[in-house]
Curated annotation (Swiss-Prot):
Its main location: membrane. The gene is SYP121. One of its GO terms (cellular component) is SNARE complex. This is Syntaxin-121. It comes from the Eukaryota. Expressed at low levels in roots, stems, flowers and leaves. Residues 1-12 have a biased composition (Low complexity).
Length: 346
């Protein structure tokens, strides 16, 4: 799951467009702007940078585990005290590095947990939000990975202990001809008396190559004890992670509460979309009103500047003057009025 979140938010950081574009299906919809969401994106960028750092440390732990397993298989073929000692030093170093890395990863995970708690106080990032669920899921996934890695180290520790126990049992049978009981084996391994016992038995029976055999056994015993000690510390880290994972897992598996939170966020998103739609309609209405008012103002200004009614009055006066001038001239083609005709007849 954390890989899925990592890929999705890596795409978010690269600047690809978000699938949530418009409120409505149209291309002229209102784009949702959420400052809190942008802040959450920045916080998630830093969060996933820390997650990638932890993943690199976990990969190094896995590599060390594989190296230790290979060295352990190699130790089964060695029968020289010096070679066993060199291999023991190498394994001790690898176990020490693994222990340091495990503790470092644990500290980083605790820091991420505190960062998640602080992030819940930001607007839009409270408990149950998408940002909080993402952070919690990814962090819990890292804890599980660390727990799996520590579990593999624990299995290696148990394998080394059981095989060393079988080695002591075989050597005891070789010297005495009897199979030791569990109590005797525990005493020989825990107290280190197996080396002294075998040395004494071999010397008494006059077996050859006593010193090399004893030195080899001593080196194997010291290697097992040192490695087991460090691996037990790793096992303690494993137990701590198991408790945290169990606690976080109980929260993540609470399906009912998550469904309730998700439904509340859906209702809130629906309300926000409806509010944005109302704002969109109001914006369009007031835009149309403003355009109409602007057209009226422009029309009034143009009419006030041009004054077309003054030009129309001047043209009418000129026409009347022309009619007067025409009336002063005699018109031979017009017949005289009846009174004038009667005067002419007289």
């Amino acid at each position: 799951m954390n890989d899925l979140f990592s890929s999705s938010f890596s795409r978010f950081r690269s600047g690809e467009p978000s699938p949530r574009r418009d409120v409505a299906g149209g291309g002229d919809g209102v784009q949702m702007a959420n400052p809190a969401g942008s802040t959450g994106g920045v916080n998630l960028d830093k969060f996933f940078e820390d997650v990638e750092s932890v993943k690199e440390e976990l990969k190094e732990l896995d590599r060390l585990n594989e190296t230790l397993s290979s060295c352990h298989e190699q130790s089964k073929t060695l029968h020289n005290a010096k070679a066993v000692k060199d291999l023991r030093s190498k394994m001790d170093g690898d176990v020490g590095v693994a222990l340091k890395k495990a503790k470092m990863i644990k500290v980083k995970l605790e820091a991420l947990d505190r960062a998640n708690a602080a992030n819940r106080s930001l607007p839009g990032c409270g408990p149950g939000s998408s940002s909080d669920r993402t952070r919690t899921s990814v962090l819990n996934g890292l804890r599980k990975k660390l727990m799996d890695s520590m579990d593999s180290f624990n299995r290696l520790r148990e394998l080394i202990s059981s095989e060393y126990r079988e080695t002591v049992q075989r050597r005891y049978f070789t010297v005495t001809g009897e199979n030791p009981d569990e109590r005797t084996l525990d005493r020989l391994i825990s107290t280190g008396e197996s080396e002294r016992f075998l040395q004494k038995a071999i010397q008494e029976q006059g077996r050859g190559r006593v010193l090399d055999t004893i030195n080899e056994i001593q080196e194997r015993h010291d290697a097992v004890k040192d490695i087991e000690k460090n691996l037990r510390e790793l096992h303690q880290v494993f137990l701590d992670m198991a408790v945290l994972v169990e606690h976080q897992g109980a929260q993540l598996d609470d399906i009912e509460s998550h469904v309730g939170r998700a439904s509340s966020f859906i209702r809130g998103g629906t309300d926000q979309l409806q509010t944005a739609r109302v704002y969109q309609k109001n914006t369009r209405k007031w835009t149309c009103i403003a355009i109409i008012i602007l057209i009226i103002i422009i029309t009034v200004v143009v009419l006030a500047v041009l004054k077309p009614w003054n030009n129309s009055s001047g043209g009418g006066g000129g026409g009347g003057g022309g009619g007067t001038t025409g009336g002063s001239q005699p018109n031979s083609g017009t017949p005289p009025n009846p009174p004038q005709a009667r005067r002419l007849l007289r």
